[in-house]
Amino acid sequence: MAAAPTQIEAELYYLIARFLQSGPCNKSAQVLVQELEEHQLIPRRLDWEGKEHRRSFEDLVAANAHIPPDYLLKICERIGPLLDKEIPQSVPGVQTLLGVGRQSLLRDAKDCKSTLWNGSAFAALHRGRPPELPVNYVKPPNVVNITSARQLTGCSRFGHIFPSSAYQHIKMHKRILGHLSSVYCVAFDRSGRRIFTGSDDCLVKIWATDDGRLLATLRGHSAEISDMAVNYENTLIAAGSCDKVVRVWCLRTCAPVAVLQGHSASITSIQFCPSTKGTNRYLTSTGADGTICFWQWHVKTMKFRDRPVKFTERSRPGVQISCSSFSSGGMFITTGSTDHVIRIYYLGSEVPEKIAELESHTDKVVAVQFCNNGDSLRFVSGSRDGTARIWQYQQQEWKSIVLDMATKMTGNNLPSGEDKITKLKVTMVAWDRYDTTVITAVNNFLLKVWNSITGQLLHTLSGHDDEVFVLEAHPFDQRIILSAGHDGNIFIWDLDRGTKIRNYFNMIEGQGHGAVFDCKFSPDGNHFACTDSHGHLLLFGFGCSKYYEKIPDQMFFHTDYRPLIRDANNYVLDEQTQQAPHLMPPPFLVDVDGNPHPTKFQRLVPGRENCKDEQLIPQLGYVANGDGEVVEQVIGQQTNDQDESILDGIIRELQREQDLRLINEGDVPHLPVNRAYSVNGALRSPNMDISSSPNIRLRRHSSQIEGVRQMHNNAPRSQMATERDLMAWSRRVVVNELNNGVSRVQEECRTAKGDIEISLYTVEKKKKPSYTTQRNDYEPSCGRSLRRTQRKRQHTYQTRSNIEHNSQASCQNSGVQEDSDSSSEEDETVGTSDASVEDPVVEWQSESSSSDSSSEYSDWTADAGINLQPPKRQTRQTTRKICSSSDEENLKSLEERQKKPKQTRKKKGGLVSIAGEPNEEWFAPQWILDTIPRRSPFVPQMGDELIYFRQGHEAYVRAVRKSKIYSVNLQKQPWNKMDLREQEFVKIVGIKYEVGPPTLCCLKLAFLDPISGKMTGESFSIKYHDMPDVIDFLVLHQFYNEAKERNWQIGDRFRSIIDDAWWFGTVESQQPFQPEYPDSSFQCYSVHWDNNEREKMSPWDMEPIPEGTAFPDEVGAGVPVSQEELTALLYKPQEGEWGAHSRDEECERVIQGINHLLSLDFASPFAVPVDLSAYPLYCTVVAYPTDLNTIRRRLENRFYRRISALMWEVRYIEHNARTFNEPDSPIVKAAKIVTDVLLRFIGDQSCTDILDTYNKIKAEERNSTDAEEDTEIVDLDSDGPGTSSGRKVKCRGRRQSLKCNPDAWKKQCKELLSLIYEREDSEPFRQPADLLSYPGHQEQEGESSESVVPERQQDSSLSEDYQDVIDTPVDFSTVKETLEAGNYGSPLEFYKDVRQIFNNSKAYTSNKKSRIYSMMLRLSALFESHIKNIISEYKSAIQSQKRRRPRYRKRLRSSSSSLSSSGAPSPKGKQKQMKLQPKNDQNTSVSHARTSSPFSSPVSDAAEGLSLYLLDDEPDGPFSSSSFGGYSRSGNSHDPGKAKSFRNRVLPVKQDHSLDGPLTNGDGREPRTGIKRKLLSASEEDENMGGEDKEKKETKEKSHLSTSESGELGSSLSSESTCGSDSDSESTSRTDQDYVDGDHDYSKFIQTRPKRKLRKQHGNGKRNWKTRGTGGRGRWGRWGRWSRGGRGRGGRGRGSRGRGGGGTRGRGRGRGGRGASRGATRAKRARIADDEFDTMFSGRFSRLPRIKTRNQGRRTVLYNDDSDNDNFVSTEDPLNLGTSRSGRVRKMTEKARVSHLMGWNY
């Protein structure tokens, strides 16, 4: 008898028997039951006495009736998932009971421990190859082991020696703006040395991969570039365009090779065939006309046949071939079409032939891709039916494996919201390098990785936030694939692990993110290039970005957008020069605004590398435009002298004579005979009406002048090549051919692949066909097409060629733009000095990391040679404008960094000692006060060229932290903010000293090019002080070069100065101080001193021992240093550093000048250092004390290394006086005079009498006494020194008057509006919208909606009326008339209306990539950049006016018990919490009648996020002026007499209050209803009331307010009830610094605790505005729909501008009834209601943070941060989009809800 089983065993036997009984093994179950009873293996039962009894199997079943027969199976199914939670298996989702290792159900943590190999295991070989790592080998193997194994075996696995984690080191080298429109195409040449970009601006550009230089521009296309291809021989590039033409250029010379015209619609794809059969090759192109063309060309002669082999594949009208792909051997090409059919063509025979049509897909085929290797005939196709198919040719047919995008990973949950897409569509497909996996991109933003053999889903990759249209496999690493999409994200993925390695977000400052449209890897895999929607080229790669630092961020050739003329064969010539574009001489490099780059950048242009400086400055003369005005002269360097030299005139005259002679001789047949010349002799084109092709609009930044495009009007003789130039230029090589060996190997490889393909095809064709075909059908659906197909669909309104004629006038007028802020700022800066264009002042500000204005005094003298005019102090405004927003953040962070150490250090001790004298630790250290020049410690001077050693700086920081001298933020050190090498060549461009203890020296260091010595444009800041036992980490470049030339060897004897004595030693060895910096010279020598000590030394601290040197008497002792030796070791001035004279001559001249200056009484206070016993606090305020005597002693000792260092210290005399004393005190004025006199004397090297200079300055001051009243004093708290001329800024009088004039904003707004009108982007928004052009109206009229506004109709909301989407239509013509009528009360009202135009644009257009949306964004950026200055100056004027008010007004305000409208802050601790309860009376839904737009909803920046307008499909005509902008309504579209009422809506937002919070009724209390009604009715009589009477009236009204409501904040209804009240203007003058660039955040406030929500209250009053008439159309008619109580909807009538409001008359259709409008009453009421909105406006801003979204152009909540909604929203469902005009609630998508609740993640 067997042993009694345990309870578990008995139960297991029972479960097994039950399981067998329920299955097919019933006999086995019976046998098992018998054996269980026989061996008594059935568990026994117990009775109530505890006795055991045997029982049968049936009894056991009855006792366990709750156990089903499959209970054992369920237990086994549950074990695996439960175990996975504790110890995951190696292959997720695999359920097995028989696994081993990590798949075993008996696994534990010990069994799953990761394996580690020793070094010898890597050296093993398995079948001649290194073994694969085990699955549980977690981290990558050690590179040392792999390298050692490779040395032993001679081979290694690529995955071992280069782990996928290495791709984390890829970084963006440069982002270059090179196009004016979206760039959809990018490609590398076959060598990887060149990059090609094709853009919607019709240009193809060639770039250098290694350094990012722009090498050439290929012109000729007249529409968007849709695709590009480079042939395999690397000799040709072909580009297809929406102009139906394929152009082919020679890569070597950029000469056009062929213009292929065989399509009748846009080109959709273009490819060179890889086939190598014979000398005839093929170029294929597919088009939107449903055709594919095979263009034959000869590989040797590069001649193309005119007629292609063409296949027209149009199964029905409208079919397009959207994509194509060649097999790797070139024998097959497959195409995908919009008719759901895949077609395959065979090129193995004499002519191409179609061999198959595959119709398995049920929707458009958007992507096809052949596999990369020729060992199988496979390709993948992706369709909008939600599937991809892997096709393979087998047994005479193409069989497919279906990849269903709805498939999910087992045990993997999708991210929330990703599976909400109702219909999945494939957007892109790709293979990995070795064809083991297929990657598909889906419209739910996921990437899916599939096994290419079985079709199994391997990984789901999530991370993108928008659709992905770019999938690019690594050229040789099968693990790596790159993806990019419209969300601006670029990801590098590891396909083996299904993980993200690296990602980059393409955020463009001030413009949101840029959608990435194309990416390509270089052939060697070291780089990849991307292009985006904003015209940028992004270069990524491994290694250092040093070479990319030499190029500017914006690179255009000035000839890029010149007009072209075309011959009958569509070849082009430059219109101005009559030359082929590739034969024109080297162009000039300009930025996006058309401004030439400095000469150092001009040498980047091929052909200009060796030009002299004067040859690099473009001299483009005056050219008359279409209006008879002159184009602004574009030169490389603006000077005050505009008179051209006589030589220039002579040269131009000779050029003109030569042109005429050549014409007469007939040598230049294409030279235009009718060329005219202007007065100055510059070339004038007689045919200026021909617009540029392409006609491009600039979209860049705020100062959008037509810069690059205006350059085409300037074509002087200097840009017309001579015969010799043409010969030299034709010999240039832009793109090299492949090396013969490389080319031969590649061709052999392609030949072999082609042979294999033919062989496979032949074999499979002979096999017996199979009759079982795998095929799945899916429901058809319509959705988004592939990128290129989509672009073709948008072409009707995106292309600029369709509107070319319409934009000619604005093109001609663009040349006279002079309103650019950047230009004016540059003039103000450069005008102060005739320095070179490498202006360190601008560079300091463009990368500001110091808050001190002393940084603005840089070494211009060193760059300018003999030019000694000192740089003037710039105004604060100039500095702020030059800096970007990110720079300002760095500025603030550095200010905090500088303040914190000060506070920390000051805690060490008191300011003054017990004896009353200053504490010694506050004294300036000796190394700063020293007047004798020394090599060490290093004392910085302006203009010093240094070698910065990172190791030494790190050692200094460690010493400071160890000694706790002051707090140091490691994160803000330069090596943590940028990539620094071990040693950098830098230049001091800014110096500032911080008060101690200890006194710190802050330096601004600009990078210098090691070769040219010019500044690269980047810089960083450091702060340090001299510390004992800490070696200098800044070494003068001169000393460094001398030390490097000595080349110390082991055993060499040297000497070194330590404590003013020579010490001797021997070089023992040379090795890097730290292994991680192997190339650094810092302390790289190990030396043995004669006193037997050993130490690390730097070569510049070691001096050779000259012959005849006296050695010490005792070995190891020192020898005193003589004065001659010290002098010989000092810095030797370079040529030009002291002007035209030598240092000795200049020093003696200035010493004599100082001596004479000290004879004057006003200079005596500055003769000697300040007496610290008399002024003990002086050293706690002034960090760098100096005086005339100190300067004189330093001059005597030749302390200064250059004249700019001397001038910098002279400025500190005035700076210190200004810092310590009152600004207007006599001592400061005296210091100003001393500084001015001395600086002018130093600057004029011919002057020897300083008293004469003093008399001249005094005379100038007397003459300019009146003018000084109009100058503005710059910030007196700045820490930097400056001259008096630095305080007085030229042309400040006008700006000061503007700041003091509260009405100056009106003129400024008119100028801004004129500027907007000059932009072509404003054209769609100038006039009201024509409802005939919008779908909702067409449906009502029964018209066809197919031909109008195609974009909106692709939307699901086709039935939505324009009026349902746009509650508040407005256009620029309305704004302009309102502004001219004087109906705006403040610039904020003007701002609201213009913002409403942009909000409407966002709300209506559904396609964020549409051209109209881009136009709106550019126009909005332009507007925001100008309006913030207008509002800022308006605020200043209002506050200035308040300061001049009588005192009794202040008493009135001060008597208020709560926060007054004056904005004066309450005492801390006494500020009261106030609640805002705006009451909605009859006029609440009316905004201001001043805008003639009584709309109800508040102006909001956060509308629904979609653009407003679309262009009509008018290819040859201009814009329809009625198709954009506002809104007009047909009076016949509705039944007359049916007046429609609308509800008022108030935003349910919480209100925050601040010290400078929203406006109140004078005393901070909310008016009662009676008071409010009184204010409304009394607004009219205020119009004729004088200012004094109004003040009295206001006081009287205030006295009636109830004191019981003092705790509440009024609704600001009295803000404009009287003209004498300043509350309205105060509402717009919160804080000037709250303006930010980007999303227009103009109303930030100090946030406090929010109170309660606003309550929606409806008024019952009737409106007074009515229109009259019955017919016609006009602008005001569109406002009629907001009228209540009218007697009809239709009709001709006079609008609110007609009467009473002082405005113009408007005639149009409206819904309002008959009757005259009461303009004045409405205007006043509207102002009051608008002020109520102002309170809400500011309240929302105080509540909301600044929110950025990546869903630009989508209808989502919180697109901008100006408001939440513009409709009343139910509190039960706050996440919706408000209600439409018809009352329908606009629901938010689930994704938008998640985004709103969770916030946007970057």
From Swiss-Prot:
Phosphoprotein as a keyword? yes
Q: Where is the composition biased (Polar residues)?
A: 796-817, 1479-1499
User: Basic and acidic residues composition bias: which ranges?
Assistant: 889-898, 1587-1600, 1627-1643
Q: Where are the WD repeats?
A: 170-209, 213-251, 255-297, 307-347, 353-393, 400-452, 456-495, 502-542
Biological processes, Gene Ontology terms:
cytoskeleton organization; regulation of cell shape; regulation of transcription by RNA polymerase II
Record's compositionally biased regions (Basic residues): 785-795, 899-909, 1441-1453, 1649-1666, 1684-1697
> Which PROSITE patterns does the record cross-reference, listed alphabetically?
BROMODOMAIN_2, WD_REPEATS_1, WD_REPEATS_2, WD_REPEATS_REGION
> Locations of Low complexity compositional bias?
846-859, 1454-1468, 1520-1533, 1601-1626
Q: Where is this region: Disordered?
A: 768-910, 1262-1292, 1326-1361, 1438-1500, 1520-1725
For this record, the Gene Ontology CC terms, alphabetical, are:
nucleus
* Gene3D superfamilies registered for this protein in UniProt: Bromodomain-like (1.20.920.10), YVTN repeat-like/Quinoprotein amine dehydrogenase (2.130.10.10)
Instruction: Say if the entry is tagged with keyword Repeat.
Output: yes
Where is there biased composition of kind Acidic residues? 818-829, 1266-1278
Q: In which tissues is it expressed?
A: Found in most adult tissues. Down-regulated in a majority of the B-CLL cases examined.
Give the disease entry from the UniProt record: A chromosomal aberration involving BRWD3 can be found in patients with B-cell chronic lymphocytic leukemia (B-CLL). Translocation t(X;11)(q21;q23) with ARHGAP20 does not result in fusion transcripts but disrupts both genes.
PANTHER family reported in the protein's UniProt record? BROMODOMAIN AND WD REPEAT-CONTAINING PROTEIN 3 (PTHR16266:SF25), WD REPEAT DOMAIN 9 (PTHR16266)
Q: Please give the name of this protein.
A: Bromodomain and WD repeat-containing protein 3
- Give the originating organism: Homo sapiens (Human)
Query: Could you tell me the gene encoding this protein?
Result: BRWD3
